[in-house]
């Protein structure tokens, strides 16, 4: 399987499964069809328009205005109730899966919540935690 994360902040690399490539330039994002591709808000903004981006599963911010990105399944993250992956509480961070999502490891993930104890600024971690969740079925590093 091929997974990529465009412009992943270095501080989040510990969240990523070893098989996920940290993509640092737009050319690497467009070079092939990804099984899972994650875009940060900055990644959405820096991709040229139109971008030749294709993925089986595309994880991107719910606020990303792009319509030129192609995916079998688009999964959004953010703090909106429309986003597939969000937080149900900011005081005691709780990762919330709002709808049934396909997993790269096989099967599906049903709507549920995962506690994120001791995590400050959890909303900034949604892309990293979401990538791990879609790849492995768990938001937690093993």
Report the location of each language-model feature.
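Walker A (P-loop) phosphate-binding motif
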Residues: 1-20, 142
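Residue-level signal for functionally critical sites in structured catalytic/ligand-binding pockets
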Residues: 4-5, 13, 29, 46-48, ...
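Generic preference for hydrophobic/aromatic residues in regular secondary structure cores
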Residues: 5, 18-23, 38, 95-97, ...
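Surface-exposed beta-strand edges and flanking loops
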Residues: 7-9, 22, 59, 87-89, ...
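Flexible active-site lid/hinge loop adjacent to a nucleotide/diphosphate
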Residues: 13-76
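Adenine nucleotide phosphate-binding catalytic loops in nucleotide-utilizing enzymes
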Residues: 79-142
């Amino acid at each position: 399987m091929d997974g990529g994360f465009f412009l992943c902040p270095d501080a989040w690399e510990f969240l990523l499964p070893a098989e996920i490539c940290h993509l640092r330039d737009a050319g690497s994002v467009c070079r092939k069809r990804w099984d899972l591709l994650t875009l940060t808000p900055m990644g959405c903004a820096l991709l040229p328009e139109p971008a030749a981006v294709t993925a089986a599963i595309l994880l991107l911010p719910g606020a990303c205005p792009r319509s030129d990105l192609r995916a079998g399944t688009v999964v959004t993250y953010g703090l909106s109730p429309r986003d597939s992956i969000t937080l149900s509480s900011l005081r005691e961070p709780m990762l919330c899966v709002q709808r049934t999502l396909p997993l790269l490891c096989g099967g599906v993930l049903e709507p549920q919540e995962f506690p994120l104890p001791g995590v400050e600024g959890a909303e900034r971690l949604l892309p990293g935690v979401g990538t791990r969740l879609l790849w492995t079925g768990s938001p937690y590093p093993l």
